Regions:
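Sec-dependent signal peptide recognition
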Residues: 2-10
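Acidic, polar-rich low-complexity tracts and alpha-helical solenoid repeat scaffolds
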Residues: 5, 14-130
């Protein structure tokens, strides 16, 4: 009988829908946005990235699009995808040139190229870009 309850608890845990899965399946975009920012602020970038990816086309042309683009670029940087992060920071500067984050984004483009640069004895393309 004791083993039955242990197996039942284990099966319930395995097949229950996690809170993150409920967020992903939710239709409320404002709730998803708030949860993505919460994950971002808690440095859980692997959970924030799919939410930001899903929300980008939804918020395009709104007031939140600028902030979302900034978070999205930094999320890529934080997971170590420096090539994509430099591209996204560049797109951020093109789309929002008068933003308060534009100077920081220019620095992050150079820093992402620096992170991508190999040793000095190898190809120096990213070093020159930085």
């Amino acid at each position: 009988m004791k083993h039955f309850f242990i197996y039942l608890l284990l099966l319930t845990t395995l097949f229950s829908c996690s809170n993150y899965q409920k967020i992903l399946k939710s239709d409320d975009v404002n709730f998803k946005y708030n949860q993505a920012v919460k994950y971002y602020n808690n440095t859980d970038f692997n959970r924030a990235l799919p939410l930001f990816t899903e929300l980008r086309p939804v918020f395009r042309g709104t007031k939140r699009a600028e902030e979302l683009a900034y978070y999205y670029a930094y999320t890529h940087y934080s997971i170590g995808d420096f090539l994509m992060a430099s591209y996204l920071f560049n797109q951020y500067i093109i789309n929002y040139p008068r933003s308060s984050h534009s100077e920081e984004s220019k620095f992050m483009i150079a820093y992402c190229h620096y992170q991508e640069a190999p040793e000095y004895s190898l190809d120096a393309t990213n070093t020159i870009k930085a």
